[in-house]
Amino acid sequence: MDRIRIVGGNKLNGTIPISGAKNAALPLMIAALLTEETLILDNVPRLADVAQLQRILGNHGVDIMSAGKRSGDHEYQGQTLHISAANVIDTTAPYELVSKMRASFWVIAPLLARMHETKVSLPGGCAIGTRPVDLLIMALEKLGAEVAIDGGYVIAKAPGGLTGAEVDFPKVTVSGTHVALMAATLAKGTTVITNAACEPEIVDVADCLNKMGARVSGAGTPRIVIEGVSRLGGARHTVLPDRIETGTYAMAVAMTGGDVLLRGARPELLQSALDVLTEAGAVITPNNEGIRVARNGAGINPVIVSTAPFPGFPTDLQAQLMALMTRAKGSSHITETIFENRFMHVQELARFGARIHLDGETATIEGIGILRGAPVMATDLRASVSLVIAGLAAEGETMVNRVYHLDRGFERLEEKLSGCGASIERISD
């Protein structure tokens, strides 16, 4: 099993290219099931989750061709996927595939919309709280599906096709919004999604669906309207840059000091996180190449932050911010409002000497001047990268175990960081 070895203390200086967003690439790949024609996706990151979804789609008979090139140290366009679902041979998504990645459950929407029946295993993925699929099932039932759960599988049928409806989510749900959006594109009539998630990845998927011939308006607002069409066609779409990767590397620079250009990053995708970093003492400068992040000399200021749906502070950057605040000049408070049990990284950060107190869903971090390297264990995707950030600033050696979590969501992490001066390497046993 691979590990990552870090010797801390080096400032980061240089350029880091930002990859395509995993949280957009996955639903975009799934949307290819809505059409018999080929969907071409550019800037798809090379990640374990993307490879796993390719296996899942292949199980349904989807043909996927991949191409990609590197044209220089800082010019990396990810891969281009040509996805053809012309011959769907199986509408069952089995447990052994779906259990490894929660987002793969979303295939239920296009399979049901286009094939009118599907059987999908209940999902897996990061072990963060319960994250139930109840809201996703509710959305499909609103659109006229007959849904049953049997033997760990969700069985959904719509013999006459789906019908447009009002889908009002009782709380904001990114997964539910993706599922309702994809399913409604081929439903008869008009669907209105209220209390919809506003994340940029939702907008990216809606933009792609519209290129395919869908009629979606309002994506990026709490009210999305979809006029159903009888069929969708092929299209070509470029995956937007990953705002979570952007925020992660920005926090790494704020942690270590230095000056880094995050090439291809778009500030409007994570303005709340950039505002927090500015408050913490980083200098954020957007330009026509991306976002420049610097912290020279001055220490790290403590902050008070609550996670929130977009445009609020992302829950997927909560662990990284906590790592940064371990070195702040004073006490910080971080409240998690999106997921329960998302403080599994606290015990591991404590191994560096961090002082963190938990009270319900709020963590109080007492900043200390020096972290000390330690052997640590990753528990989930975002928690694992918070340990890397801590290790970059810690005195001595840090060994991060279970780095397969990192491979699910960060493309070439060691290469990008070492290219900016970090002492970081992957060790394969």
Curated annotation (Swiss-Prot):
2-(S-cysteinyl)pyruvic acid O-phosphothioketal modifications at: 126
Residue stretches spanning the membrane: none
UniProt entry keywords in alphabetical sequence: Cell cycle, Cell division, Cell shape, Cell wall biogenesis/degradation, Cytoplasm, Peptidoglycan synthesis, Pyruvate, Transferase
Intracellular or extracellular location(s): Cytoplasm
Main location: cytoplasm
Binding residues annotated for phosphoenolpyruvate, in chain numbering: 22-23
Pathway assigned in UniProt: Cell wall biogenesis; peptidoglycan biosynthesis
Catalyzed chemical reaction(s): phosphoenolpyruvate + UDP-N-acetyl-alpha-D-glucosamine = UDP-N-acetyl-3-O-(1-carboxyvinyl)-alpha-D-glucosamine + phosphate
Family: Belongs to the EPSP synthase family. MurA subfamily.
HAMAP family named among the record's database cross-references: MurA
Record's protein name: UDP-N-acetylglucosamine 1-carboxyvinyltransferase
Protein's organism: Nitrobacter hamburgensis (strain DSM 10229 / NCIMB 13809 / X14)
Gene: murA
